[in-house]
Amino acid sequence: MQPTTWDNPLGTDGFEFIEYTAPDPVALGKLFVQMGFTAIAKHRVKDVTLYRQGEINFLVNAEPDSFAQRFARMHGPSICAIAFRVADAGKAYKRALELGAWGFDNKTGPMELNIPAIKGVGDSLIYFVDRWRGKNGVQPGSIGDISIYDVDFEPIPGADQHPVGHGLTYIDHLTHNVHRGRMVEWAEFYERLFNFREARYFDIEGKVTAVKSKAMSSPCGKIRIPINEEGSETSGQIQEYLDAYHGEGIQHIALGSADICSTVDGLRNANVALLDTIDTYYELVDRRVPNHGESTPELRKRKILIDGVADEILLQIFTENQIGPIFFEIIQRKGNRGFGEGNFKALFESIELDQIRRGVLKDTTTS
């Protein structure tokens, strides 16, 4: 991602980790292994496991009587925290509190890092991390080239510390689903605390329901968060998520790949369930995205979606729900900084059709 031109008061520099929890955390670990992640380290004093693929760090928190497990009792399988890389964690935390954020009383053990955190969407946490490998261009092995995992975690013997997996390399973006009327409030939260700016705005209508979304982007250009709410009075897919999750939260995580076809092949071979796309979608690809330069038969074979214009192509595919109502997006960018806007309506309508078939929605257009 290219850096933006506006002020970066916290020195944000991307995502550090995503923290997951569940009543059955073992199932999370099995899912992540299917997705190409490797368990590479264990927390020194807590029941927390670090899974890695490329530059993506997933934590599974199974510590009894912890914030994470209390979160799981309320939400089920869920994302209880995310972490932003910042220049100075202490200063970032202080500034966030001064601007109205709610702090979190982080219980730390002996010789454990105290990583400051504030309350985020749905009472999940946003951690501030200022230690990571390669920060400010520091070379490997140099003094100061240290991460939070070097301090708080012990490597699992024999585990590759830099696994390639299925070729997923970075966290591209994540989304929030919020109650109707709260989208602007959460957008202003990120703008006020982190100086995020609106990168995109969507207002998509299906046959029965609609959705609104503000996509917010950080000054570093590496943290992007579309915030979604229902766009009509009819309860649709956003409300279904809110009901299943018992509140607001993170809807999906988008993971980047440099070769989406290879990644999708790996995921399918590992039995990760991916969303289907009707064949007629591909009959219109060349008309909708002329001169895209991709092999339409190869995209059709793998059910990969395409969007953009010539020289600015985005390829994407979505998993089925994997962690409660949470799913994953696999994305490859070829000069395109969007979110697949051209696919949104098609995807939205396909999910809406599934809801109608399951009886969640009633199709009033046929009555």
Predicted regions and their residues:
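N-terminal beta-strand motif that seeds the catalytic metal site of vicinal oxygen chelate
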Residues: 1-25, 79-82, 140-187, 246-255, ...
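Core segments of cupin and vicinal oxygen chelate
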Residues: 10-57, 98, 106-109, 117-120, ...
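Contiguous mid-protein beta-loop-alpha structural module that forms a pocket-lining wall or clamp
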Residues: 121-123, 132-133, 163-168, 206, ...
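An N-terminus-focused feature that recognizes amino-terminal "leader" regions
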Residues: 1-157, 314-316
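Active-site-adjacent "gating/activation" loops or surface patches in catalytic cores
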Residues: 220-238, 246
